[in-house]
Curated annotation (Swiss-Prot):
Signal peptide: none annotated. It comes from Chloroflexus aurantiacus (strain ATCC 29366 / DSM 635 / J-10-fl). Digests double-stranded RNA. Involved in the processing of primary rRNA transcript to yield the immediate precursors to the large and small rRNAs (23S and 16S). Processes some mRNAs, and tRNAs when they are encoded in the rRNA operon. Processes pre-crRNA and tracrRNA of type II CRISPR loci if present in the organism. The active site is at 53, 125. Homodimer. PANTHER family: RIBONUCLEASE 3 (PTHR11207:SF0), RIBONUCLEASE III (PTHR11207). This is Ribonuclease 3. Mg(2+) binds at residues 49, 122, 125. Residues 161-229 form the DRBM domain. GO terms for cellular component: cytosol. Belongs to the ribonuclease III family. It is found in: Cytoplasm.
Amino acid sequence: MSDRLAELERAIGITFRDRTLLQTAFMHRSLFNEQPHLLNHLTDNERLEFLGDSVLHFVTTTWLFETFPDQDEATLTNWRAALVSTKGLAECAAQFNLGQYAYLSRGEDNPGGRSRQKLLADLFEALVGAIYLDQGLETARAFIVPFWQARIEQIIHIDLDPTTRLQELMQARFKQLPDYSIEEERGPEHQREYVMAVTVAGRKFTGSGSSKKEAKRAAARKALAAWDKHGFTATAIDAQDERN
């Protein structure tokens, strides 16, 4: 176990003062369901996940606020959601192959189990929580920010041109184009609001704006957010609640 932890420390570039925190970050709850006696001396990683989620949101919020002083709240909120999405965190975890360090039950440790997005995202959150407790906020920030620096340009591209991005993804995945329609026009002539809908893999996403173009972009952005969150699969989109 100590060799595995040392290998992970080298991979992430952080040496823990308290290695039990690092070990706990990779203790999946399923292991304790299968072997409850382990609870006598070990703890699952769910509390660290909870803490890490908060640290990630705080660090991400402050970094975006400081890095993009001219952007409004809505834009920064969209970018933050993309950075800390399950898919985004899973991609961060995959860079260090965090799944291989997880302690899982036999049922969870099946082919492909260690590469599941939800598992990887949870492990990344727990690792951030462990780093914060062991090293403090500045070390946690230094660990997190490089991931965002590497990803933000792509996220900005998606956010600034969502209709083009959605079209590219639909053509690549389903060999078809998004289907847009006007759902509603409301308000007085001088303050008109438009509601546009886009249908993606059988699911409808709506967006509103002061022009048809703006509403179309809002609908595309909402579809992309749902698609990215669920790994861009038709099944996941079909399961996505229409209110999202």
